Structures are given as structure tokens and as C-alpha cells.
């Protein structure tokens, strides 16, 4: 729980934050004026201070998604290290999932074997340019510590993605965090890939922290073996550039990700429907003429794409037309209310079709990004 107060007009309104929901409270008429001015207001910024250790206050900035009455629902917020400290120019993302994607463990072993001491000086493993919201950015994947803070150094840190900011606003920080969260989603084929910590820097010096719902103190990953042979500089730049086309809540230009699930939703009717929607979205991007042809229904679209990637069915006893017909039939039974959650949980054939659809959607995504079929065959799809 975070406590503090926001500035409004010439006064201060106390608050508490829990689960990114800010509750304002006071007997002063100032709260009434605030609610009158901000009731049902969307996407605005408020400033304030948070209570730190003892009597120390820290400057805070809040991006409000919307507010109802005296409750503000937050997209994210920034807490500066000191009350007068408000300048930052770089955001640093720590993610165990992106550590795996950028091959932290394997790069670490290579650097240590080469005689590099990462406890003394950090090293940049990769530098990747990308564009977001019509602005150019540079991503640096850095490993190690700079030792400037002594015992205050973050010794749990492994790798860190550092992105210099262009307009230095909280919205830019939020957009960047969403883009790299989506990168982790696509690479791991999983919907829950939280950041462990997001730090704000001024010339390599930590000056504050960024908080959003995409974070978790319990974030952990063990998927590094998936990316053992990944050629990072061959695949990640193109994928990142595509994902960064959409930094908002709607995906209209980049690859779809809404069909990805977690452990609980992996095999469910709802996710199956979302997979079909993702497939149709990509098919329209790849072959708009056939997608708009009424004589080319879903079953034919599926068969066409499975024939484009025959390696997906090498270990299956079914042909592309049989698989496509089964997928079409399952979607029909869901639409008519004949399929239920427990049907999916206990049907190994349906589960296999869901796994096949995941692989097909990832292949189609890579094809749309601009990779050749030969390159796609070398991409680690699990």
C-alpha cells in the first residue's frame, strides 16, 4: 500500500493506493471540487508526494486511466528517489523473461570465460534501434553492475533493458513498458510475463522507480533453454520494430497477442475462439484478396496456411484438410454453445489442435513481420 497526497489547486488531498486504485479522502471541500472537476475524466496526470522512510517525502507522478468519484484508477505512477529529484532520461526494465530471450545466462558464461568481471563493470551485450510513436529509440541490453551506489546496488539484477527517453514523460514510460511486455509475450508464447523492476535513470544514476500492473515482485522464468540457439540480432530487431507499431491498447498494425494464454486458460473455449480471431486477423494481413473472398471460408484459409507450413504437421497423423475441418467444427460447436470448459480440459485431440494453432499463428506472424520461410524454420517455436 502506498500513502501520500496529491496537489490540487492550492491544497493537498491525502490518498492511499492499493492494486493501482487510488482512494482520495479528506473532510476538506477540496475533495468535492476535485471530484466535480475529474469525475469520469480519462487519461490525465496528477502530481503529488509519497511518504517514504520516516518523515521523508518523495515526489510522485500518476497517470490516471479514469476516475469515478473519489477513486482514481491508475495506469502507472512514478516515485522519485527524493522530493526534489524529478529529472530522468532513461528507463531500465528488468525482466526474467527478457533475460531468457536475450540469452543472459549464455552471454554471462561467454563473458566470464573471456575474463570479464561483470561485478566491476557492466557490459552491453546488444544494441538495437527501433521506432515507436514516430520517434527513434535505441535499446541496450546491459549486464553487470556499475558499483556507484555501493551497498545500495541492486545485487539481484541480472540483465537490464535500457532505453533513453525522447520526450521524458510518464506516458512514454508506459508505452515502452507495454511494447517490451508484448515482446516477452510473443517470444515466450505466454500471456503472463511480468517485469521484476523498472528503474528511472539520469546519466546512469538511479533517480526513481516506475510502477504499473505489468510488474510483479514474484516474477520468475526458466525458459532460457528455449533460446539457447536464438540469433538475437537476426530475429529480435524485426520483431521489436513490428510490435512497436502499436503502443496503445488496440492492436491494428502489429502482430496479434490476445490469443496467448496462461496455465489456467491454455485449453479453454474462450482461448480457442481468440486463436481463430488471431488467425483471421493475420490471414487478412497476408492475403487480403482471399480473406475477402466469400468463396474462401475459414476451413479453406486454414488448409491453405497449413500447406504453406507443412513442417507443422510432420508429426501429426492428420492432413491439412482434416485438421482444418476439425478446427472449423470446434468453432461451430462453441458458437452454438455445445462446447464447455471441461470438454477442452479432458480432450487430448482438442488440446493438440490448440497447440498446432499456436504454432501456425506464430509462423504466420513471423511471415508477416518479414522473415522468409527458411528463416522461420530456424526460429525456436515451442
Language-model features, listed with the residues they occupy:
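Short, conserved secondary-structure transition motifs
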Residues: 190-217
